[in-house]
């Protein structure tokens, strides 16, 4: 009889967790209508090629040759999203992992580990910026957190980049959209660390920033070196750091770094 009760209780817990997971999935599925892809990479590449073949191509060719070009655009209803949550600061998009979520910035780094974008308590939480970062992504390193959900939602898919770096090589560009601009970051490093490592240092001085990128190179499992980050470091260098838990009840974290390679005003 006791065993039957224990089994019944376990089934109830699993059912409750399953319902909560589904609520989280539904919440973010409903938000997708506020951010739709308007231009994919193939179409953008075709447009760049067409421009290069036109009569007035010299300036266009120079622009393309300077580096990677922004090739994805999202039609985002910023006003509607801000009305839902005043902490809304932008949208993150990475096509290979079907990662597409609003980003919030709270008054601490705890609240949005428990509450969704719609401020409903749920284990999915939200994708959120470190509260010490500037909401316009202007810090040298902007840290963005999300839960490692078992169903692969939120930042649960980031571990795929560690397990299969070919995903990065095929498409290394993470996009951040704000009301003011579009920013494209090239994934430059991936690794596992702990929650008290130098990864989470918010650097201030040029010396600290140089030390930080050297640290990344030393600890990274995957490292982009064309060109090497420390060799291309300038006062205009901007990074994003995506962080999620690695393993259940663990202090370890899966970390993905991206370096800003292109941006444009909206």
Describe the role of every protein-language-model region:
Residues 10, 14-266:
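Solvent-exposed, non-transmembrane regions of membrane-associated and secreted proteins
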């Amino acid at each position: 009889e006791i065993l039957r009760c224990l089994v019944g209780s376990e089934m109830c817990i699993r059912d409750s967790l399953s319902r909560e997971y589904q609520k989280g999935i539904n919440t973010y599925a409903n938000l997708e209508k506020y951010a739709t892809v308007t231009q994919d990479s193939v179409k953008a590449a075709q447009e760049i090629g067409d421009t290069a073949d036109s009569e007035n191509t010299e300036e266009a060719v120079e622009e393309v040759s300077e580096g990677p070009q922004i090739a994805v655009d999202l039609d985002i209803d910023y006003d509607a999203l801000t009305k839902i949550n005043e902490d809304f600061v932008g949208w993150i998009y990475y096509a290979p992992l079907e990662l597409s979520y609003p980003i919030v910035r709270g008054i601490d780094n705890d609240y949005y580990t428990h509450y969704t974008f719609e401020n409903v308590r749920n284990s999915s939480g939200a994708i959120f910026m470190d509260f010490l970062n500037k909401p316009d992504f202007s810090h040298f390193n902007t840290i963005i957190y999300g839960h490692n959900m078992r169903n692969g939602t939120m930042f649960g898919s980031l571990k795929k980049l560690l397990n299969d770096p070919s995903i990065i090589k095929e498409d290394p560009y993470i996009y951040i959209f704000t009301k003011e601009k579009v920013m494209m970051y090239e994934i430059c490093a991936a690794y596992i660390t702990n929650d008290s490592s130098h990864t989470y240092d918010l650097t201030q001085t040029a010396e600290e920033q140089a030390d930080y990128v050297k640290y990344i190179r030393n600890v990274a499992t995957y490292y982009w070196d064309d060109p090497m980050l420390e060799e291309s470091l300038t006062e205009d260098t901007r990074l994003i750091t995506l962080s999620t838990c690695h393993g259940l009840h663990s202090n370890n974290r899966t970390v993905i770094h991206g370096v800003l390679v292109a941006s444009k005003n909206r």
